[in-house]
UniProtKB/Swiss-Prot annotation:
It holds the Pfam family DUF751. It comes from Porphyra purpurea (Red seaweed). The gene is ycf33. This is Uncharacterized protein ycf33. Belongs to the ycf33 family. It is found in: Plastid, Chloroplast. Its main location: plastid.
């Protein structure tokens, strides 16, 4: 029975390692952009603009009014 529980405990650790590996694989190309100041600046501006647009879209979709 202890062998069964040892096998069951392995799966959550495997899931966490797969998710972390996927996140690092997706994010790692963006770290290259931060090496040069000019590309870093444009990346930050683009990311901020994307967040603003997504926030506005979600607020309109959910009919959320601020203040």
């Amino acid at each position: 029975m202890s062998r069964f529980w040892n096998n069951v405990v392995k799966f959550p650790r495997f899931l966490v390692s797969v998710i972390l590996g996927l996140i690092l694989t997706i994010i790692s190309p963006f770290f290259v952009l931060f090496r040069k100041p000019s590309t870093s600046f444009f990346f930050i501006i683009s990311f901020t603009g994307l967040l603003v647009v997504l926030t506005a879209i979600i607020k309109k979709m959910l009919n959320i009014e601020c203040c």
